[in-house]
């Protein structure tokens, strides 16, 4: 079975990892210049680097649908630049998963594939998808919804070790992002972690820099550029998060509900 995942950031990567480990072939699509910050555990880095490995699963960049299918036949994840999902006609996946996490629907419709699964707010099942998976941290994280919508976006990041909004760093100005920091660095409150042009941006808390935008990305004021983990454990940068794993499990459950992937 082939599944086409829209988005290839950290949550989408958690989805893809669970699918691949369950024996499902995966093609992931993202924009030409991805803007994810948790790059050490995001398959979209294959667009920038050519290939990347996360938790033992390799993802490789493909230029065409045919090349993408060849890559999936090796057991690897294929990553394509296809923000408008134009490759669907050639790929003919059994299911489409929208894991862009844009907090709104960027064009996913129920007729894209026999099964269409969405992730996070901005979708209503069964209106624009067959099922949608909850992404808000808390009691309902990872649950499959077949009638209705997930909880609305609050604009406040999930709480980790007592910190929510403080752990995410947004650009104070428009400009080209650059940093001499690296994901995994231990930082202290007040440290400069990067710049938008000549304007510095600082962390508000102590912790481990677990997310950092790639250098050279054009940002607007308020753009999410970095994420500090207050737990301070640098090893976490190498592992898919608890949230992404839970959401991935929900997508896998929805896929089993909507298709015959696990039926003899």
Residue ranges and their predicted role:
Residues 1-264:
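Well-ordered secondary-structure scaffolds
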């Amino acid at each position: 079975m082939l599944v086409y995942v829209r988005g290839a950031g950290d949550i989408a990567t958690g989805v893809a990892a669970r699918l691949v480990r369950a024996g499902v072939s995966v093609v992931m699509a993202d924009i030409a210049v991805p803007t994810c910050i948790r790059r050490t555990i995001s398959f979209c880095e294959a667009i920038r680097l050519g290939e990347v490995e996360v938790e033992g699963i390799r993802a490789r960049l493909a230029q065409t649908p045919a090349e993408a299918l060849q890559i999936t036949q090796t057991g690897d994840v294929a990553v394509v630049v296809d923000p408008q999902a134009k490759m669907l006609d050639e790929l003919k996946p059994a299911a489409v998963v929208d894991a862009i996490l844009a907090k709104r629907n960027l064009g996913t419709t129920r007729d894209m594939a026999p099964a269409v699964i969405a992730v996070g707010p901005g979708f209503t099942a069964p209106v624009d998808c067959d099922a949608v998976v909850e992404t808000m941290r808390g009691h309902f994280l990872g649950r499959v919804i077949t009638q209705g919508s997930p909880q609305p976006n609050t604009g406040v990041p999930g709480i980790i070790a007592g910190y929510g909004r403080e752990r995410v760093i947004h650009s104070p100005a428009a400009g080209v992002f650059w940093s001499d920091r690296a994901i995994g660095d231990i930082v202290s409150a007040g440290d400069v972690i990067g710049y938008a042009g000549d304007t510095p941006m600082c962390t508000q808390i102590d912790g481990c820099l677990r997310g950092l935008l790639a250098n050279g990305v054009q940002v607007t004021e308020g753009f999410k550029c970095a994420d500090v983990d207050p737990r301070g454990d640098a090893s976490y940068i190498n592992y898919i998060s608890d949230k992404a794993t839970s959401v991935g499990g929900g997508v896998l459950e929805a896929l089993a509900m909507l298709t015959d992937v696990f039926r003899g």
